[in-house]
Amino acid sequence: MSTNEGSLWGGRFADGPADALAALSKSTHFDWVLAPYDIAASKAHARVLFSAGLLTEDQRDGLLAGLDSLASDVADGSFAPLVTDEDVHGALERGLIDRVGAELGGRLRAGRSRNDQVATLFRAWLRDAIRRVADGVLGVVSALATQAAAHPTAIMPGKTHLQSAQPVLLAHHLLAHAHPLLRDVDRLADFDKRAAVSPYGAGALAGSSLGLDPDAIAAELGFDSAADNSIDATAARDFAAEAAFVLAMIGVDLSRLAEDIILWSTTEFGYVTLHDAWSTGSSIMPQKKNPDIAELARGKSGRLIGNLTGLLATLKAQPLAYNRDLQEDKEPVFDSVAQLELLLPAVAGLVSTLSFDVDRMAELAPLGYTLATDVAEWLVRRGVPFRVAHEAAGAAVRAAEARGVGLEDLEDAELTGIHPELTGDVREVLTIEGSVNSRDARGGTAPVQVAKQLNVVRDTADRLRLRLRT
C-alpha cells in the first residue's frame, strides 16, 4: 500500500491507496510543465487570502518568500517531483512546506481545489504555448513568401486531380500554401479570447465561501476575466479541444505542403532539389536524397488528428462537474504542441532552401493540353457561347492528340473545320506566358495579381504577429 504521504487528500481514509492505484493516479511525468504556472497562481492566491483577512501580512510575506525560493529551485532543477508525489500540485505543496513549515504552508490551500487550480494552469500554459506555435507557423509563411518573391515569373503546371490543368505561377502556388497557415494563426489568436477566462476561485465546483476575489487573481495572472459559472469553470475543456483542433489543422495544412514537396522532389516531377542539410540518405542506396522532413510532417499530421479525436472521445460523456477522466486532457494537447515545436522550424528550413528548376517546370507547363481553357475563353471573347466553345476546344484537343502535336501546331484548316470562329489567330493565346498574364482578376495567377497577393500575405503576417504580442 502507498503511504499517501504528500497527498492533498486522505483525512477521510485510514490507509493510503493501493500501489496500482497510486501508479495509475500519478501525473508528474507530464504535468510538471505546469509548475511555474502553479507557483505564480499560488502567489496570487496568497495575496487574495491576505486581502480576505485569512492571512496576516507576515504570513503572506512568508508564503511569497517561500514560493520565490521554490520557483528558483524548480527553474534550476534542484527541486523536482519525488516518486511519492501524485501530481504537480502535491509536489509543490511539499516543496513549500519544506521551506516555510507545515503550519504556514498548509494555509495556502484554503479556498482552492485542484479542480479550479489545474483548469487555470492548463489555460495559462496553453495561452503561452499557442503563441510559440503561432510564431513557428509564421516562420513557415515567411519562408513561403520569400520563395515566392524570388520566383515572380516562374511558370509551372497547375493541377487538379493531380492531372495537368492550367499553367500557374510558382509564386501563386506557394502563396496558396501560405494562406491556410495564416488562417491557422488567426484561429490561434482568436482562441485566446476564450482561453483568457480564469477558473480560479471556483473551488471544487461551487465557488468559495471565504470572501476570495476571483477577478483579482484573474488580473494578476494575465487573464481577461474570471469565469461566470463555477461549475462550468472546473468542468469545461472545450478550450483544450479547440486548441487541439487548430493544432491538428496546422498539421493537415503542413501535410499538404509536404506532399507537394515530396512529389516535386521525385525524378518524375523534377521541380525541386532538396538542400543537403534538410534531407537524408539511404543506408543501402548511395544515390538517394530523401525528403524526411516532409514525410515526417505528413506522418505527424495523423498523430495530431489522433490527439484531437482522443481528447473529444474523453470529453464526450462526462457529467458535470469535474471527473478524473480529465487527467487525460493534457497529454494530447501537450504532445501536439511539442510535435509542432519540433516540426515547424524544420519545415521552414526545408522550404527556405528548396532549389527550383524553373526551366523544367516551364517545359512541363503546356503539356497535357493545359491551354485548352484559353482556347475556349478566346472563342467566348469572340461571341461564341461557352458551351459551344468548350466543345470546340475539346475537339481541338482530340485533333491534336490524334496527330501527336500541341494545340499551337494544328493547321488553320483544322481549326476552322472544328468551328468557323476558331481561326489561326487563336495562337496568340497558346503560350504559357499569355495564359498566366490573361488571368489578371483579383486572386488570379497573373504576375501583377500574384505580386499583390504576396503583399497581402506579408502584411497579414505582420498584423498577426502584432496581435499575438498584445
Swiss-Prot record:
GO MF term list: argininosuccinate lyase activity
The family this protein is said to belong to: Belongs to the lyase 1 family. Argininosuccinate lyase subfamily.
Pathway per the UniProt entry: Amino-acid biosynthesis; L-arginine biosynthesis; L-arginine from L-ornithine and carbamoyl phosphate: step 3/3
Domain of life of the source: Bacteria
Enzyme Commission numbers on file: 4.3.2.1
Protein name, entry field: Argininosuccinate lyase
Annotated localization: Cytoplasm
Primary gene name: argH
Catalytic activity from the UniProt record: 2-(N(omega)-L-arginino)succinate = fumarate + L-arginine
InterPro entries: Arg_succ_lyase_C, Argininosuccinate_lyase, Fumarase/histidase_N, Fumarate_lyase_CS, Fumarate_lyase_fam, Fumarate_lyase_N, L-Aspartase-like
PROSITE patterns (alphabetical): FUMARATE_LYASES (PS00163)
Main location: cytoplasm
One Pfam family linked to the record: Lyase_1
Any single biological process term in GO: L-arginine biosynthetic process
One GO location term (cellular component): cytosol
Keyword set, alphabetical order: Amino-acid biosynthesis, Arginine biosynthesis, Cytoplasm, Lyase
